[in-house]
A protein has these predicted regions:
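Structural signal for the C-terminal ends of transmembrane alpha-helices
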Residues: 27-31, 50-58, 97-108, 182-190
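Aromatic-anchored segments of alpha-helical transmembrane domains
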Residues: 23-31, 66-78, 122-131
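Alpha-helical membrane segments and adjacent membrane-interface helices in multi-pass membrane proteins
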Residues: 38-101
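Hydrophobic transmembrane alpha-helices
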Residues: 2-62
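Membrane-embedded alpha-helical hairpins and interfacial helices in multi-pass inner-membrane proteins
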Residues: 109-193
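Membrane-interface helix caps and helix-loop-helix hairpins in membrane proteins
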Residues: 30-36, 77-86, 104-108, 162
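Central hydrophobic cores of alpha-helical transmembrane segments
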Residues: 21, 60-71, 114-122, 179, ...
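Short helix-perturbing small/polar motifs within transmembrane alpha-helices
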Residues: 81-126, 180
Length: 203
C-alpha cells in the first residue's frame, strides 16, 4: 500500500511540475517580438498538444488556456487587437483542436509519436487560420487560386504565409521534442529500491 501511495504522490508531483513548466513557457511565448521574420515561432502549439497528452482533468485544458489568455491580455493591446475579434476566436479554436490531438495520443510514451502529433497540429493551425483569413479578407479572390495564395504567399505587402508555416512547424517540433522528453521523464515511475526512474521510449 505504501508503494502505491508513493507512486500516486510521485505522479501528482510530476503533474504539478509540468503545469508550472507550461505556465512559465506560456507566459514567455512572445520572445521574438523584435524579429518579425520569426513571427509564429512559439511554444504555444506544443503546450496545448502536451497538455492534452500528459495532463488530466481540470488542469489539462485550463493550464495552457490560462497561459495564453494572460499573455494575450498583456500583449494584444499594444497591437490594437481584441480577444473577441473573429480571427482571435478562430486561433483559440485551432489551439483547442491541437489539444484534442494531444488527447488522442494521451498515454503514449513515444517521443516520435508526440512530435508527429506536433507536426499534425502545426498543419491544422496553418490551414485553419490561413483558410479563415481567405474567407474574410477581401484581398483574396474567393477561388481555389485565392485559397492557395492565402496558404502560401499570403497578402501582398505582408510576410509570406509559408514563412509563418515554417516558423510554426520548426518551433512546434523543437518545443514538442524538448518538453515531451521532459514530460516523459517526469512521468517515469521511480523504483522504491533503487530510487531511479526507468528510461522512456523515444521511438
Amino acid at each position: 500500500m505504501s508503494e502505491i501511495n508513493q507512486q500516486a504522490k510521485s505522479a501528482h508531483h510530476a503533474q504539478l511540475r509540468f503545469v508550472a513548466l507550461v505556465l512559465v513557457i506560456g507566459l514567455s511565448r512572445h520572445l521574438p517580438l523584435s524579429h518579425p521574420e520569426w513571427s509564429n515561432f512559439s511554444p504555444v502549439l506544443a503546450l496545448f498538444l502536451l497538455s492534452g497528452a500528459h495532463l488530466r482533468g481540470f488542469w489539462s485544458w485550463t493550464t495552457p488556456l490560462c497561459a495564453i489568455l494572460v499573455t494575450d491580455l498583456i500583449i494584444n493591446p499594444s497591437y490594437g487587437v481584441s480577444l473577441l475579434e473573429p480571427f482571435m476566436l478562430i486561433t483559440v479554436l485551432s489551439y483547442l483542436l491541437v489539444f484534442l490531438v494531444g488527447k488522442k495520443i494521451s498515454g503514449t510514451r513515444s517521443l516520435a509519436r508526440l512530435v508527429g502529433g506536433g507536426i499534425l497540429g502545426a498543419l491544422l493551425f496553418h490551414f485553419l487560420t490561413c483558410g479563415f483569413a481567405w474567407c474574410i479578407n477581401p484581398a483574396y479572390a474567393k477561388s481555389f487560386n485565392g485559397l492557395i495564395q492565402a496558404l502560401t504567399i499570403g497578402q501582398p505587402g505582408f510576410p509570406p504565409a509559408y514563412l509563418f508555416l515554417r516558423n510554426t512547424m520548426v518551433s512546434t517540433i523543437i518545443f514538442t521534442a524538448v518538453l515531451g522528453w521532459i514530460a516523459l521523464r517526469l512521468k517515469e515511475p521511480v523504483s522504491p529500491t533503487t530510487g531511479k526512474a526507468s528510461t522512456a521510449s523515444t521511438s
